[in-house]
Amino acid sequence: MSFLMNKPTSRTVPNLLDELAYVQPEQPFVVDGENCLTYGDFRNLVRTHAKGLLSIGVKRGDRIAILMGNRAEWLIAYFAIMNVGAEVVALNTMASPRELAYQLTHAEITVIIFEPWFRDRDFLEVLGEVKREYGLDPLPTFLPVDTDPASALTFGQLPELGALVKEDALAVAQAKVSSEDTACILYTSGSTALPKGVPLHHWAMIDNAWSIGERQHLTPDDRLWLAVALFWSYGCVNALFALMTHGGAIVLQHHFEPGEALRLIECERCTVFYGTAAMSRPMYEHPDRPNRDLSSLRTGTTIGTPEQVQLAVDLGASEICNVYGLTEAFGNSCVIDAKMPLERRLVSSGPVLDGVKIRIIDVDTEENVAAGEMGEIRLHGHLTNGYLNDQERNAEAFDSLGYLRTGDLGTLDEEGFLTYRGRLKEMVKTGGINVAPAEIEAVYSRHEAIAEIYVTGIPDDRLDEALAAVIVSKGEPPTKTALVEFGRKVLAGYKVPRHY
């Protein structure tokens, strides 16, 4: 039974877990396959692993990377790292060796916790290539979550090592964690060729997520289906803490597959849907859907056109919330209330969350536009304090009043409800994922047969936008097959253009 009624008082993630485990120790928190961890169970596992991290020398301010699919160990590692005052760097499981090498080096990673296999990827081989081809200095400590004969140490051995660490040592480490400390760093595509490291701090992560959960009217009885990758802000910042601050349970799907998603929602009686149209459409069109009981679904969040938002409603989430946000703003800045009429929820992201301010700006005059007029969306309040190791980008990203230049276009009505209108920047959103054309162009410009290349997005029924490349060749044009193979060697699959 849960006794959680009010907003948690904790201002750091470790303290939040302590608070919830004290209030509702027997309440389910993490469901991963056949395993269900209560808040009390989960806290105990986090603390034993946190002491293990202390035993191998992890300290406040260190940056520890996580590279794995959605599984309980991802969350245990996430909370254990923050418990000792270190910073989590969530790595994309689709990233190429080149991309991983950049992020591991840029963030100065000291330890990487990973699963040896993810779907069809051998991460032991991938990380070996990173070491051979790109070099890592200093070389991080590698901690596989599963047994690996080639590894001297595994993530699973941390509790045994931590048994030698006194509780007082962990208490001291946790006490030093501040509400303004960086909790995690997420990499997101930017308007240049290299991704941006976005640090997010403890208190805003908790406070913003609480407001997101309030707009959905979440309670401890809710169970959130999570197939969105935990390495996205939509997963490890938005969904996780919106649900956790309201005392509910997270039902993990290791990776998205529509048939399995339908089965999980039915079997686990999930009430909260978190997904994009690239997920809801294949779920709706799946042949198993008519035979699945999805009546437990109630609310959740999604993004997209009215037709795309309607897909979540058609799956059963009748109180779905349309949202607007970005990684730099802790996932969401605007969320429409689940109880608003559907016709409003289909088109509007609603008003800003508590702790957030918004302006719609004429980029030519830098003045506010009138209600109903379109301009650039600028945000203030719950935001990153700036990009990691990148003062030049920081100077460009924030205006003279400290508002974030989102590069997105929108309108505000008389009630302050935001409607998203498109992108000011050249960013392409394919399958719900932001991709920078400049990054792709920089890779393909190294192809021996390409003289010039321009990458853009074109309308796509399934992905919203699909990547397309316009190429000027130096001689005989390369085939589409050759271009796809070239791109897949250095880019994540979703960044490889589909049309040439």
For each of these PLM feature ranges, what is it?
Residues 206-226, 231-271, 282-286:
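Conserved AMP-binding/adenylation subdomain of ANL enzymes
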Residues 9, 26-71, 75-79, 96-101, ...:
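Conserved AMP-binding/adenylate-forming core of the ANL superfamily
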Residues 160, 267-275, 284-345, 357:
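Gly/Ser/Thr-rich phosphate-binding loop
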Residues 55-56, 84-159, 291, 473-476:
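Structural core segment of the AMP-binding/adenylate-forming
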Residues 351-355, 367-397, 435:
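Conserved ATP/PPi-binding loop(s) of AMP-dependent carboxylate-activating enzymes
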Residues 38-40, 176, 183-207:
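Conserved AMP-binding A3 loop
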Residues 10, 26, 144-147, 151-153, ...:
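Conserved pre-ATP/AMP-binding loop-to-beta segment of ANL
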Residues 95-105, 112-114, 378-381, 385-386, ...:
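AMP-binding/adenylate-forming catalytic core of the ANL superfamily
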